[in-house]
Amino acid sequence: MSSYANHQALAGLTLGKSTDYRDTYDASLLQGVPRSLNRDPLGLKADNLPFHGTDIWTLYELSWLNAKGLPQVAVGHVELDYTSVNLIESKSFKLYLNSFNQTRFNNWDEVRQTLERDLSTCAQGKVSVALYRLDELEGQPIGHFNGTCIDDQDITIDNYEFTTDYLENATSGEKVVEETLVSHLLKSNCLITHQPDWGSIQIQYRGRQIDREKLLRYLVSFRHHNEFHEQCVERIFNDLLRFCQPEKLSVYARYTRRGGLDINPWRSNNDFVPSTTRLVRQ
């Protein structure tokens, strides 16, 4: 269990509690979680973070009424900047989006502006929102993570408790390599409910070569680990930077959706540009 799982900042969350579903607009349903909760134990300070990045959200269950009462549907794309004070708690995000269902808006841009304003207020940071009509996305191919998949290794694993021990002495030689490694075996659990979170992860780096067996064992050790998606990605970035000391590093995870939302955080210390096309399990 994470050291901050019982922190008072989490006590008021609706996550893990019985809730009413409201279908008229209510911005107060949104709840934020301080990023400092997981950054402080990692020694990460807001004014000197070793990375930049965003939390990319896809909103699949977004609907409202137009001015004449006709329902509208869209797919939303939200990017929340890494410098925001809070991350957005996903169940509260779902409840908030449900509150649009029977609410009239004059036009699509009013919906977009409302989302941007409310999410920015909750996160206390920069948020961008784009809305897409369904025909704009129809026929879009399933994406994939570029890189070498490290999953098909003939190894025995019997430990699923999180540990950084696998990253000790995980690099070898003095030769500098530049490679992209991919795993689809990332599984962690919600910090509050302990429900499973399934994801694929892409690790791009330049530096001494990382032992792929040790890296895979490290990633599999998240299997019983309880943390939010964004926190796991920052932990992985921080651990790789600390133990493997690459010159350049980017970590990008795309998680399967829950409640009509998927969360796709990335962190990088270079000019990494994430792909935004959904993966096969999304």
From Swiss-Prot:
Residues binding NADPH, per UniProt: S90, K91, R258, G259
Alphabetized UniProt keyword annotations: Cytoplasm, NADP, Oxidoreductase, Queuosine biosynthesis
Molecular functions (GO terms): preQ1 synthase activity
Signal peptide: none
UniProt xrefs under InterPro entries: GTP-CH-I_C/QueF, NADPH_dep_7-cyano-7-deazaG_red, QueF, QueF_N, QueF_type2
Lineage top rank: taxon: Bacteria
Active site: residue positions: C190, D197
Swiss-Prot/TrEMBL GO biological process terms: queuosine biosynthetic process; tRNA modification
Annotated compartments: Cytoplasm
Keyword Chloroplast appears in the UniProt entry: no
UniProt catalytic activity: 7-aminomethyl-7-carbaguanine + 2 NADP(+) = 7-cyano-7-deazaguanine + 2 NADPH + 3 H(+)
Binding residues annotated for substrate, in chain numbering: I88, E89, S90, H229, E230
Assigned GO CC terms: cytoplasm
Transport listed as a keyword: no
Quaternary assembly: Homodimer.
UniProt similarity note: Belongs to the GTP cyclohydrolase I family. QueF type 2 subfamily.
Function: Catalyzes the NADPH-dependent reduction of 7-cyano-7-deazaguanine (preQ0) to 7-aminomethyl-7-deazaguanine (preQ1).
Name assigned to this protein: NADPH-dependent 7-cyano-7-deazaguanine reductase
Organism of origin: Escherichia coli O6:H1 (strain CFT073 / ATCC 700928 / UPEC)
Taxonomic lineage from the root: Bacteria, Pseudomonadati, Pseudomonadota, Gammaproteobacteria, Enterobacterales
Chain's gene name: queF
